[in-house]
Regions:
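Core RecA-like ATPase module of SF1/SF2 helicases and allied nucleic-acid translocases
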Residues: 2-181
């Protein structure tokens, strides 16, 4: 929750972003994705934690009760770009569990498009698994990240929010271990 607050503050007060999402925004993949890399040699998958910049954003649309956009994305760590569908509803989600619930709902809505496959659950699942919407990238803004997501990364500047509320760690020792890791 606090990461979302920081990301919104950075976007609106420092970067002067006015739209919900814009070209130039930096996003972090929040769930591994193998679908969009199939047509790119040498790119096995988009990993949870990969940070990408939006080079182009178009065709924002609502479908199945959710919002999607076509995006051209550029890796900040490697020399490649990729075209994919981004699932806009996941950008402001507070937890992976919430995204999992949204994914289940999306599955059910897509299944309604294929009543002829209702008798063959296997064929229905195979069809849905090939949907660009079911495979849309789940992402979050990447201006502020959690301590967990930052592990293994290299950063020029680090600001640690040492909030010592119930959500952070249990007990004083847990807090200091977390702070050491950060």
């Amino acid at each position: 929750k606090r990461t979302n607050i920081y990301n919104q503050g950075i976007r609106t007060r420092i970067l002067w972003r006015e739209e919900e999402i814009e070209t130039g925004d930096r996003l972090m993949v929040s769930k591994n994705n193998y679908f969009w890399t199939e047509k790119y040699d040498g790119l096995p998958f988009l990993a949870n934690g990969d940070i990408l910049e939006i080079k182009r954003l178009r065709n924002v649309r609502e479908l199945y009760g959710f919002r999607f956009a076509d995006a051209q994305l550029r890796s900040l760590d490697y020399d490649w770009e990729i075209d994919a569908v981004v699932w806009l509803d996941t950008i402001y989600s507070d937890s992976p569990e919430a995204n999992n619930e949204l994914h289940k709902q999306l599955f059910e809505h897509i299944a309604e498009d294929y009543p002829e496959l209702a008798k063959s659950k296997k064929k229905l699942i195979e069809t849905i698994y090939q949907s660009p919407y079911y495979n849309a990238l789940q992402m979050r803004f990447a201006y502020a990240v959690t301590g967990h997501k930052s592990q293994g990364g290299q950063w020029k500047h680090v600001y640690v929010d040492a909030y010592k509320g119930g959500e952070l760690c249990e007990g004083e020792d847990g807090f200091y271990r977390w702070l050491y890791t950060a």
